């Protein structure tokens, strides 16, 4: 059973980063940094597929094995892959420090082999009042992504 994972984020533009995942008890601690962002919040999600053959678009929708509507990371109604937002400072750097109790590095909610994506816009956490909000959080285009792999 994997206890650690890593993801290298890359895109067509300046956005890049490295994200680390570590299983701790019933949670996964997600840490790292992303550079090249515009200042402010950016949606941060695990997507269904580990397929980046056509850039980030081939990663599919948010990882959602429970067939729920999109929500925030603390909501009961959320996709497993909904990790909310990361916030970039005025220098375009987002420091990631998330503890989540729904994603896993093993079993049916495992994120290993799936794609981590950072988005162009803030995630409205499913509260945007339209259909797209309940699917994507209106987070916009995919700036950078990478497949989550087992780490030592």
From Swiss-Prot:
Binds 1 copper ion per subunit. Binds 1 zinc ion per subunit. GO terms for molecular function: copper ion binding; protein homodimerization activity; protein phosphatase 2B binding; protein-folding chaperone binding; small GTPase binding; superoxide dismutase activity; zinc ion binding. Its main location: cytoplasm. Cu cation binds at residues 45, 47, 62, 119. InterPro entries: SOD-like_Cu/Zn_dom_sf, SOD_Cu/Zn_/chaperone, SOD_Cu/Zn_BS, SOD_Cu_Zn_dom. GO terms for biological process: action potential initiation; anterograde axonal transport; apoptotic process; auditory receptor cell stereocilium organization; determination of adult lifespan; ectopic germ cell programmed cell death; embryo implantation; gene expression. The modification N-acetylalanine is found at residue 2. GO terms for cellular component: axon cytoplasm; cytoplasm; cytoplasmic vesicle; cytosol; dendrite cytoplasm; extracellular space; mitochondrion; neuronal cell body. It holds the Pfam family Sod_Cu. The modification Phosphoserine is found at residues 101, 104, 106. The gene is SOD1. Disulfide bonds join 56-145. SUPFAM superfamilies: Cu,Zn superoxide dismutase-like. Destroys radicals which are normally produced within the cells and which are toxic to biological systems. The lineage of its organism: Eukaryota, Metazoa, Chordata, Craniata, Vertebrata. Keywords: Acetylation, Antioxidant, Copper, Cytoplasm, Disulfide bond, Lipoprotein, Metal-binding, Nucleus, Oxidoreductase, Palmitate, Phosphoprotein, Zinc. The keyword Repeat does not apply. Its EC number is 1.15.1.1. The keyword Disulfide bond applies. This is Superoxide dismutase [Cu-Zn]. Zn(2+) binds at residues 62, 70, 79, 82. Belongs to the Cu-Zn superoxide dismutase family. The modification N6-succinyllysine is found at residues 4, 10, 90, 121, 135. It is found in: Cytoplasm; Nucleus. Its cofactor is Cu cation; Zn(2+). It catalyses: 2 superoxide + 2 H(+) = H2O2 + O2. Homodimer; non-disulfide-linked. Heterodimer with SOD1. The heterodimer CCS:SOD1 interacts with SLC31A1; this heterotrimer is Cu(1+)-mediated and its maintenance is regulated through SOD1 activation.
